[in-house]
Structures are given as C-alpha cells and as structure tokens.
Amino acid sequence: MLGVGFVFFFFSRFFGGLQTTLRPFSFSFGLAPLECPPPAAKPAFAIEDVKSPFTLRSNVSSTKKKEKNKPSYTFPVPQPKLESQWREMEWTEEQKASLMKTISSYRPSCHEGTQARVLLLGPVGSGKSSFISSVQSVFNGRVTNRAMVGTSSTSFTKKLQSFNIHGQKGEDPTGLVLCDIVGLGGGEMTGLTLHDILSVIKGHAPEGHKFSPDQPVRSETVGYIKKPGLKDKIHCVAFVVDASKILTYPKDLSTTFRLLRKHISDLDIHQVALLTQIDQMCPETAKDVTQVYKSRIIQDMMNKAGDLLGMSTSYIVPVKNYSSELDLNVNNDVLLLRAVDHILQYTDLHFQDNAPQHTGPKIDLGI
C-alpha cells in the first residue's frame, strides 16, 4: 500500500505541475470567436479613381510570373474547315505589291494632317509593339524589331512612342504613324489612366511622355500641348487582343473596353481591332496562314473578341505577328498589310468627317 500511495502521489504532483505549466497554451472548444470576412478581391482590370483620373490596371496575382513558361492556351479540338473563305483574300505576290503601293501612297484627305496617327490599345502582352515591328518588317524586306518588345507579364512599353512606318528602300516614309503606349493592366505603379488615354487621343500628351497613375498628363506636364492641331491628335484607335488569352482574360476587362470605347466614340474617333496570336489557336492556320478564313476556330475567336470589345466582327481583323521567324512569308505579309489597309480606311473616315466645310463664294442674287 505504501508503494501504491507513493506512485499516486508522484503522478499527481507531476501532472498537476505540468497542467499548471501548460495552462497559458490550453485550448477550449467553446464558441469560435467572430472573424471579420476577408476583403473582397479587386477585379483584375479595375477602374479606380486616382485624384480624378481613372486608373486602368491589373491586380492579377504575381503567380502568373511563375507560369510564364507555360503555354497560355492549348489547341482546341480540331474542327472541320469551312468549304470557302468567309472573307475574300488573295494570297499572291501581286496582292502584296498592290497593298504596299496603296499604303505607301496613302496621304490623309485633309491637308492639315500630313500623317495618319493610329493609337494601339490593348492588355499587356497583346502584341501591340510586335504588330508595329511586323508591319515595318514587311516594308524593310526582312524581319526587324523596330518597336522594342518584351516577354514579361508587365508592360515593356512605358511611354508614348510614335513610329512613322518607313516605305521601301529609296521611297518616302508612308503617311501612317502607329502610336504605342503602356498596356492596360500594367500593375499598381504603371497603370494607364483613362485621363491619360484621352489626353493622348486629344493630342495633349507630348511624345516620350512616361505614364504614371500618380502623375497624370496636365497643363504643367513638360511638353504639354495646350492647343493641339489635327496633326497632334489620334485619328483612329486600334484595339489589340490576344486570341490565345480571350478565354482567360478577366471578366472586368470587357467593362474596361466598353468604357474606353464610349469615351473614344464621344470624340468621334473610329475604332477597329486586331486579333493576334491566331497561330496559337488553330493548328491548320499555324501551318498555313492562308487557312485563317476557313478556320471555324478563328471564326469563333473573332466572335468572342467582338463580345469582349462590344464591337461588330466587321471591325476586327486577324493578324500573325513575326516573333521567332528570321524570314518573311508572303502570305503572312498579305494578312498584315490587309490589316493596315483596314485601319487606314477608318482613319480616312475621320479626316472626311472633320474636313473643313467650304461653302464657296457668296452669290449676289440681286434681290
């Protein structure tokens, strides 16, 4: 009995001391404390008020950087081709030469504006800079990267850059200027504001202006153009969207596009759209770009791009930019040149709409 009592005394003292020692870390299973709900996530392409201008920027998680080596989209299930092209195209050297001549000789119908200024607008990585370089490559006769192109998830272009497309060797520059700016959804510190976009279109933003949401274009901005002429303004806007990302773009991007289109339309500026990366969507088109208008997949992507932009597909043209190629391809050149010709048609409408009205000399009717 003495031994049993001793053991009982020992264990009671030991566990009693242990309980006292661990009391601050003990858990009770009563009612769980009330917790504040997590803050609602901001939309990926939010339009936020920043000291009066609206910021169009992305709040997408940085985890995308870890996945940058993954393909953005895999080929859909192959579908039977259409029997005929749903847009008429001629894939010949003669057609390429004809389009190049048309573009090279183009001059705005209004004498005040000597060049047609086209602004490219689209999400980061949509192919704006690549399109500029691809078009210039066609006229250079070899693949060149005139507009610097990046591959990161943030916008490589940080400032307003205007590229006058040069004609073929020995020819004068064309009457076309393609303007490149930071992509939509460029991040917290490089976001593009609606205020700045409209300032560029109205002709107030100086060439080389570096965009920052906390330093919007104002009259105090260095180089600010107080009274822009027609030559300083944008005459057409071309939205650029990546076909391989249409199904993964944030839903709020459509709202952003529609807001932009409303404000741009209020300025009487015509708008078109370029659908890039078509070769990543359709294996047949990747092999042979002449199949683009026979592809049901591309036709479906065109419709989806129209829904995203709130735009009829008649304004949208598919293109394949030069990226890894070292040599030009005549069929790809024709597709690119048709896109430029499409842009110029709507650009010229702007000049026609804004041409000065000449009423002619007054006639004395002797009344």
Where are these regions (language model features)?
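Short, flexible boundary segments at extreme N-termini or domain junctions of P-loop NTPases and their
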Residues: 2-4, 18, 27-123, 156-171, ...
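Hydrophobic alpha-helical signal peptides and transmembrane signal-/tail-anchor segments
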Residues: 5-13
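Switch- and interface-adjacent substructures of P-loop NTPase systems
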Residues: 106, 110-112, 123, 135-269, ...
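A structural signal for isolated positions on well-ordered beta-strands in alpha/beta enzyme cores
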Residues: 119, 270-273
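Conserved glycine(s) of the Walker
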Residues: 127
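Two-metal-ion acidic nuclease core segments, chiefly of the RNase H-like superfamily
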Residues: 300-305
